[in-house]
């Protein structure tokens, strides 16, 4: 089935939130969607994001931290910004691109429980999207 839609998760550094969103997206949406993530900048995958996803048996050690790819951005069926900075400075998307904002707190530099909380919130949001389309 190569008629998959494309979903593109964006945040500032493609380090924490968008990495977790990509992983959850592949788990919940992978049969119907091509799932990608990127950042305004590429800060590298945060080790605590890797650890947090490992706790829920999802391995993201092979995911890479990437800057926004205009080719993916301009052909995505859905672009999801995960932080207000990415929402405001994201390159403009063509009018036919569906772009939504799902805001999540940035756990970087915060205590471990913040990574767990944000991981779970992102997972629940993507699970809801997989079930309802919203």
Swiss-Prot record:
It comes from the Bacteria. Gene3D superfamilies: 3.40.50.2300. Signal peptide: none annotated. Pfam families: LMWPc. The keyword Transcription does not apply. Disulfide bonds join 11-83, 83-90. The active site is at 11 (nucleophile), 83 (nucleophile), 90 (nucleophile). CDD domains: LMWP_ArsC. The keyword Transcription does not apply. Catalyzes the reduction of arsenate [As(V)] to arsenite [As(III)]. This is Arsenate reductase 2. It comes from Bacillus cereus (strain ATCC 10987 / NRS 248).
């Amino acid at each position: 089935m190569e008629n998959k839609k494309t979903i593109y998760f964006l945040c500032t550094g493609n380090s924490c939130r968008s990495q977790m969103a990509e992983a959850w997206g592949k788990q919940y949406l992978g049969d119907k969607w091509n799932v990608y993530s990127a950042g305004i900048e590429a800060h590298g995958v945060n080790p605590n994001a890797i650890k947090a996803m490992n706790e829920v048996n999802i391995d993201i050690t092979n995911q890479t931290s990437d800057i926004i790819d205009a080719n993916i951005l301009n052909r995505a069926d859905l672009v999801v910004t995960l932080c207000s900075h990415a929402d405001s400075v994201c390159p403009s998307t063509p009018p036919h691109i569906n772009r939504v904002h799902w805001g999540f707190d940035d756990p970087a530099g915060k205590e471990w429980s913040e990574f767990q909380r944000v991981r779970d919130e992102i997972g629940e949001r993507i699970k809801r999207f997989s079930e309802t389309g919203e």
